[in-house]
């Protein structure tokens, strides 16, 4: 399944993997998965984290390595984002709940994920998604951007 991914997608997933793999040892543990989930406002139990890892841990060693992560992402891309998942993702970014993602909100979430972005990079991300030019991202623009990925 992972062989249907483009090189660009694989590079993006490698970057995502390294956000999870906090100690850089090439595997994602339940602890590391929990850290990232909590930084996104989720609060999974230890059992839920273990279940998530077990779902993709094909060699049964209790952690996720990059090939396992790739096959998970390839699977996830096939069941493309349901509307519910998109709404949840939008809410993670729209911290004040006003229906818009501002540059500050985008920077905050990206920083929580370990991505230190310059103001220029944040502004560029907003500009790319901001169809109506109001300087922030509304839900429709967010959906368009997510579907274009």
Curated annotation (Swiss-Prot):
Q: Which residues bind Ca(2+) 3?
A: 94, 96, 98, 105
CDD domains (alphabetical): EFh
Q: Which residues does the annotation say bind Ca(2+) 4?
A: 130, 132, 134, 136, 141
Residue list for modification N6,N6,N6-trimethyllysine: 116
What residues bind Ca(2+) 1, as annotated?
21, 23, 25, 27, 32
Q: Does the keyword Calcium apply?
A: yes
In the record, what lineage is assigned to the organism producing the protein?
A: Eukaryota, Sar, Alveolata, Dinophyceae, Peridiniales
| Protein's recorded name | Calmodulin
Give GO MF terms, alphabetically: calcium ion binding
Q: Where does Ca(2+) 2 bind?
A: 57, 59, 61, 63, 68
């Amino acid at each position: 399944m992972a062989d249907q991914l483009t090189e660009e997608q694989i590079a993006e997933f490698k970057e995502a993997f390294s956000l999870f793999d906090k100690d850089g040892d090439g595997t994602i543990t339940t602890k590391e998965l929990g850290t990232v989930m909590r930084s996104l406002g989720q609060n999974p139990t230890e059992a839920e984290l273990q279940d998530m890892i077990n779902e993709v841990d094909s060699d049964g060693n209790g952690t996720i390595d990059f090939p396992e992560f790739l096959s998970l992402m390839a699977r996830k891309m096939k069941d493309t984002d349901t509307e519910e998942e998109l709404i949840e993702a939008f809410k993670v970014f729209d911290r004040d709940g006003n229906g818009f993602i501002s540059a500050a909100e985008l920077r905050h979430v990206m920083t929580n994920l370990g991505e230190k972005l310059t103001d220029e990079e944040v502004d560029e991300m907003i500009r790319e998604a901001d169809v109506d030019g109001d300087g922030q991202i509304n839900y429709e623009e967010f959906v368009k951007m997510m579907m274009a990925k």
